[in-house]
Amino acid sequence: MRIHSSFVALCSFQATFAVASTAWPWQTFKSSPHEPPSLKVSKSGPVSPGYLFFDQSWDAHQYSVFIMSDNNELVWQSPPGDLKGFRVQQLDGNPVLTYFNGLGVPEPFGWGYGIIQVLDQSYSSIHNVSVINDNYTALGSINSSSFVSWIDMHENTMTSEGTMLVTGYNVTQCDLSSVGGPKDGWIADSLFYEIDVKTNDILYRWSAKDHLDQIPLEDVQPFYPVDDWGHNSSAPYGYFHINSVEKFQDGSYLISSRYYCSLFKIAKNGSVDWTLQGQTGGDFELKGIQWAYQHDGRIHHEQEDGFVLSIFDNANSDVSNGTHHTEGMLIHVNLATREASSLQTLHDPKDEIYAVSQGNTQLLPGGHAVMGYGSNPKIKEYSSNGTCVMTAQFGEDGVVASYRAYRSPWVGIPTTSPDLFACSDESNNKTQVFMSWNGATEHKKWKIFGGNTRGNLHPVSIVRKTGFETTASVVGGLKYVRVEADGFGIEKGVSKVVSVKEMC
């Protein structure tokens, strides 16, 4: 593995992205073309088991999603693309990977158009969750003729019923005169869907615009005023900005609106059951807590009279920022008394972050929590008492972004062949062998075979796997090499035969 840095890098996928100006280092390998970021990791206590799952964008060296270990070793890197919301979920009792794949529209808009891709443990794509035609109009400056799906990047939550909750943004006309905008104005309407993962059948659809009587435009003005927005389809007023969806046990939904600074319970008939607003409380009394511009509202420990809510409290946005640090919040929502009270807040006093966009809070089974900081490319893990025990950074603040970050156990069983590079160290009568297998987690050793003819190779060494790329020095000047991954349950870990390069 080599660590590199540069002041110029260019990434493209379905659109041309900005030239990177960051000097944040990345890794390179002899056997593999992948170039993940070099994680700067600090720990002050035990962390939970599992790998880190994250995406990177903005001026990142490579637009991809990554599985990496705490010790800065790559496990798997995807092909390049504008990919977001990368995590492990369950489908039919089996672990799968899910992420948005499409076109992200950067701030000040901050939404996207694409599919949710579902991969199995071999990293094969098994489902593309899509909304193909729902009378959408794209942002006026975007050519949507090649779009295959209109799903937005903000959500991809799998339910136990084999459905997925996703979001969408539709540019449409709306009367904005009540808040000082044009009567024939334009908005970015926020929608969410529940979709059958295997058939793409839409089982439920909700639109914020359809419920302006219960969620009026006037209520959002203190947090996201209309100003000059809404005069045309290229600058629609994105007043609601949906960014997460969860499902209650009774079949209703919990949705998060960034600019209303609110979470809403949406009944099965589409009406708004209640509003939990981060500054005023809405239909609840706030007991010593406040939040603003939150992301990632999640339901935990649901009971008849209440539940625990976790949110990523940005407390900052493009409208208002720099006055209060970002933190994770665990909130007890008492439905009987209509009170919301703090159970725990999560932030690192040694590294206060002001995340103006994106981010998430993941509660782990053992009591720890992981937070991805969105516009600030950091992942932090907190112990059960709220102490930060790990920070992993992969870019400069405000230069590289990551929509969400997670920690999860994962077993990867790729069906692709391992990658291999070999070169001659003639002066020392040795052959240098570099081997890797993108996504493989289960092999412990490498068997190396070599010889002077392609069809007559014999065992020359067995070496322990030492990371994403393992390097071995084999005595003798070989002409051809192949390797095999060795470990429990490994069936397809055989590389192609490669010729040994004359120079390393």
Residue ranges and their predicted role:
Residues 1-20:
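Fungal secretory targeting signals
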Residues 17-504:
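Histidine-/acidic-rich catalytic cores in large beta-rich domains
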